[in-house]
Amino acid sequence: MKYKTTSVSIIYINEDMINQRIDNFLQKKLKNVPRSMIYRIIRTGKIRINKKRIKPDYKLKIGDKLRIPPIKILCEKKSSLLTTEYKKNLLNNILYEDNYLLIINKPSGIAVHGGSGINLGVIEYFRKIRPLEKFLELVHRIDRDTSGVLMLAKKRRSLLSLHKQIREKKVQKKYIALVHGLWPLSLRKVSEPLLKTHLKNKQRKILINKEGKPAETYFKIKKQYLFTTLVSITPKTGRTHQIRVHTLHAGHPILFDKRYGKRDLDCNIKNKTKINRLLLHATSINFIHPETGKKMHIVAPLDVYFKNYLNTLI
């Protein structure tokens, strides 16, 4: 492993940085520095604000002068994701952009952020390609294998406003999925608590468990095929892998779901297009614009692979 030592950096806190705890701010800023080291350099007084020592829970104020000392960090590996094709794939999928928001139609197979062996995700990519953006954060997340609407905030106050809307359930997201079998007309809601677990291989998996958090998902049949059903889905809660686990619980897993699907069922499906992606797509999002107060409705079209697969079905 290769390491490098950073130089001293001075940051003047602006309105997009205020009201954050210093430990959380540094964790975002110092990507390859362990959280334990961040706490250590705060506790030992190496991090200074306005030339004074601070505690990890100190909240940043506008005009604060933050001094970050030289820090030994792990060098980033060069990522194969920064290719022309990757760049084109993301930039051509921008659905909406203004001074406050960036909304894209995320392709399947691209993570929203780095981690777990992934060097770059959507957020890291846009930060690299747009270094002049002072602030850029994910408003919400969608699974790596799910395609569709993804919102990023370009101002901290926009992020906080949208997070408030999400907490108050004022943001509505809709999905479509192709599931195995004929979905019953009477099955319009699945309401089962979800619990995060970790398997022996450290992989995270979500299970239905009474000790878990409440989760509620609504379903509506869009079209039935011979062996599959296209369903419209509205999650009322935003739990990790909620839709994938609730469809499995209903006995109708999503096609080509490698974690929660049924491999034998996937193998039995005639796959003329050789598609191998999770057939789950975030089709639209409704929210109030954080600056203008305007009602927003953003729609993400299906990608060509999902669309072509549907065209092969009878």
UniProtKB/Swiss-Prot annotation:
Q: Which SUPFAM superfamilies match?
A: Alpha-L RNA-binding motif (SSF55174), Pseudouridine synthase (SSF55120)
- Check the record and name the InterPro entries matching this protein: PsdUridine_synth_cat_dom_sf, PsdUridine_synth_RluA-like_CS, PsdUridine_synth_RluC/D, PsdUridine_synth_RsuA/RluA, RluA_PseudoU_synthase, S4_RNA-bd, S4_RNA-bd_sf
Q: Which GO terms of the molecular function aspect are on file?
A: 23S rRNA pseudouridine(955/2504/2580) synthase activity; RNA binding
Q: What is its EC number?
A: 5.4.99.24
Q: What class of enzyme is it?
A: isomerase
Recorded hits in Pfam families, A to Z, give: PseudoU_synth_2, S4
Q: Where is the active site?
A: 143
Kindly state which keywords UniProt assigns to this record, in alphabetical order. Answer: Isomerase, RNA-binding, rRNA processing
A single BP term in Gene Ontology: enzyme-directed rRNA pseudouridine synthesis
Q: Which residues form the S4 RNA-binding domain?
A: 20-94
Q: What catalytic activity does the UniProt entry give for this protein? A: uridine(955/2504/2580) in 23S rRNA = pseudouridine(955/2504/2580) in 23S rRNA
Function, as annotated:
Responsible for synthesis of pseudouridine from uracil at positions 955, 2504 and 2580 in 23S ribosomal RNA.
Similarity annotation = Belongs to the pseudouridine synthase RluA family.
This protein's name: Ribosomal large subunit pseudouridine synthase C
Q: Which organism is it from?
A: Buchnera aphidicola subsp. Schizaphis graminum (strain Sg)
Recorded name of the encoding gene:
rluC
